[in-house]
A protein has these predicted regions:
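Sequence context of c-type cytochrome heme-c attachment sites
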Residues: 29-56, 80-107
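Proline-centered structural pivot motif
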Residues: 102, 106, 122-165
Length: 167
């Protein structure tokens, strides 16, 4: 008689179960940390990539961290953000990441000391915490393009809707 033996059916069943498990686990394995996801949206890096949440090339962990896997230690840009959180807390605020990130960019700092302010590096899609990652356009040209695109204000956090606001 045709068909699979009991062992063959068992192997197929186990194989199908493993395939389903891999498919269900993939989104979790590919998920990005919340801060990185927020920064990608805030920097508009998601605009041209509908699958940005699954594409780690959109913003690597090394944007803020020394190690490719994230965690401590932080690079100079990541340290600037950490300092921003501390300053925010010392001022009695409950800093949300988008607000602290925007404050760091508005400060017009150059965390990695490469001659390009952090906000310009965000605009040019280079790494603001890595002095070896620099925009390929001259500073003046980059500044003009940045200003034409809206300057640092383009990275302002989206206004939060308040349930206490009156119409």
């Amino acid at each position: 008689m045709g068909g699979l033996s009991a062992d063959g059916r068992r192997v197929r069943l186990v194989g199908a179960g493993l395939a389903a498990l891999v498919l269900l686990a993939a989104p979790v394995a590919l998920a990005m940390p919340r801060y990185r996801s927020q920064a990608i949206v805030q920097f508009h890096y998601d605009a041209d990539n509908p699958l940005w949440e699954l594409d780690r090339r959109v913003m690597a962990c090394t944007y803020c961290h020394v190690d490719v896997g994230g965690g401590a230690p932080w690079n100079p840009f990541g340290e600037a953000i950490r300092v921003g959180f501390r300053a925010d807390a010392e001022a009695g605020q409950k800093g949300k990441f988008p607000d602290v990130l925007y404050a760091v960019l508005k400060a017009d700092g150059d965390a990695d000391g490469d001659g390009f302010p952090d906000a310009l590096e965000v605009f040019a899609r280079t790494l603001p915490g890595d002095p070896d990652s620099r925009p390929d356009r001259p500073l003046a040209e980059l500044q003009a393009g940045f200003a034409a695109a809206g300057g640092v204000a383009q990275y302002a956090p989206k206004a939060q809707k308040s349930s206490n606001s009156t119409p």
